[in-house]
Amino acid sequence: MAKNYYDITLAMAGISQTARLVQQLAHEGQCDREAFHTSLSSLLQMDPPSTLAVFGGEERNLKMGLETLMGVLNANNKGLAAELTRYTISLMVLERKLNANKQAMNQLGERLGQLERQLAHFDLESDTIISALAGIYVDVVSPLGPRIQVTGSPAILQNPQVQAKVRAALLAGIRAAVLWQQVGGSRLQLMFSRNRLFKQAQNIVAHC
């Protein structure tokens, strides 16, 4: 069956967007607010009608992720680009471990379901919800291993609010990696279909 590279690229951009958010948070203590909102919102999309619907139905919501993906595909993998590649691959590895663990998958679904009730009282980007998302990552995803080593400013990374946002972003990255697998993504494409992914991302960015 022919691969749908549009959907694969969108899902891949979802992973890249969370990798970039983690990088921004770790180095600067803050991140692009709109991109963060898109990534967090994707965690609530349990039964989306399309790949794009997971990210709010607008290609522009993934602009940062698409640009990050293009940078990673085109880079020599040094410095910050190497960091982004490492986060991306680590999320893909963790997703495979999650997928193989039915108990963890069920627990993740239950915890995200409970979160919807909290959202009746709190904003998605409130400290309460971000802490809850971070807690889900620590309780459900982290034990599956290996741990994702986040690098950045040690002083910034000691801040509990930054730590919570990083973990919430990583959880959204796992969501995007699950989607990526569902639409036919595979790590082999990063080696053998780089040009195709790059051109597809370029085409989408052109009308963002």
Swiss-Prot record:
The entry's keywords: Cell inner membrane, Cell membrane, Coiled coil, Cytoplasm, Membrane
Subcellular location: Cytoplasm; Cell inner membrane
Bilayer disposition of the protein: Peripheral membrane protein
Keyword rRNA-binding: no
Domain of life per record: Bacteria
Similarity comment text for this entry: Belongs to the HflD family.
Protein name: High frequency lysogenization protein HflD homolog
Species name: Serratia proteamaculans (strain 568)
High-level lineage: Bacteria, Pseudomonadati, Pseudomonadota, Gammaproteobacteria, Enterobacterales
